[in-house]
Every structure is written in C-alpha cells, then in structure tokens.
Amino acid sequence: MMKIIAFVGMPASGKSEASRIAAEMGIPVIIMGDVIRKEVLKRGLEPNDSNTGMVATDLRKHEGMGAVARRCISQIRETGSELVVVDGVRGIAEVECFRKEFGKGFILISIYAPIEVRFSRVQKRGRSDDMNSIEGLRHRDERELSWGMGEAIDASNVEIENNFTLETFRKDVRDVLSNYLEADLEK
C-alpha cells in the first residue's frame, strides 16, 4: 500500500523544513504550494503573497476546496515510490481528498509554532510570497483558516511542536519519519 505523509500547519510553522528533512532521508516530496506558484506564473502574475492568495482562493472557488490536492495526486503517483511526503495541506477538504484516494495509507502530521516564532522565521526566509508584518501574517492565518486549516490540523494523526531549536525540530521530524519508513520497510 502506498503511504502518504502530509504536513499541515500555519504559515512558517516548519513544513518546508520538515520536507527538506524527508528529502534528505530519500523520501520524494510533493510541495502543494508549487501548484499555486506555478498557476500564478501561468497567469502572468507577480509571485507575491497577495497574488498567491488570490490564485489559491480562485482555484478553490472554481474547482472546489480540494483542487490543489487533486492536482497533486498524479504527481504523487508519478514518483513511483511507496512512501511520499506532501508539504502544505491547507484545509480539511484536501485531507478528505487524500484520504479518499489513499485510504489508511494517508498520514497527516501537524506542525505547531506560535505566531511570534513564525513571524521571526518569515523575516529570515525572504520568500517573494511572504508577508512583511505580523499583521500580514495574521491576515494570512485568517485566510488559510477560512480554507479549513483548523479542521485539518485537528484531523492530524501526529503533532510535532516546533518551538525549540532547529536541531530539536529536525530530530523530532526524523524520528517520526523514521518510524513510518521502518514500518514501510518491514512489509
């Protein structure tokens, strides 16, 4: 059975770092935000927070709340891997879409970090679609919560707290992923 491990969490909680760790472990990673960023560029828009949010909302409005997840399923299958990590679930409809497609093989891991910690990270990472104030981060949190992010977080199988050092977080993520990787290898 194919196993999908998806990360869910508020912006800058550590999903991308967790995905980097998975990639270092040799696990293929599908980044849901890349679907949105690709669509932003396809529409000829500048890749900033406003346009990214507008396109994400538009896709969900016209294709349903599971639109981004549905666009990722073929990419997941194309990896040919029995274990794939998905970075960036944004709502309960996406969780339901993945659970319908992969059944018990879908595992959801939520990553938690307080807003002050997340904003500090946003300031350091310098992505073009990032927000430049804590109010901007709160606005993005509200937008993502409107997509069912809170329900998705509540539906997670495992929670990893990312409120400590990077080394602690990396160890926690490796431990959780190793458990699933070992279970996969034992089959």
UniProtKB/Swiss-Prot annotation:
InterPro entries per the UniProt record, alphabetical: NTP_hydrolase-rel (IPR022970), P-loop_NTPase (IPR027417)
Coiled coil regions in record: none
Pfam families: AAA_17
Protein keywords: ATP-binding, Nucleotide-binding
Recorded GO MF terms: ATP binding
Amino acids binding ATP: 9-16
Keyword Zinc: no
Similarity remark: Belongs to the UPF0200 family.
PANTHER family referenced in this protein's UniProt entry, alphabetically: DEPHOSPHO-COA KINASE, UPF0200 PROTEIN MJ1399
Name of the protein in its database record: UPF0200 protein MM_1313
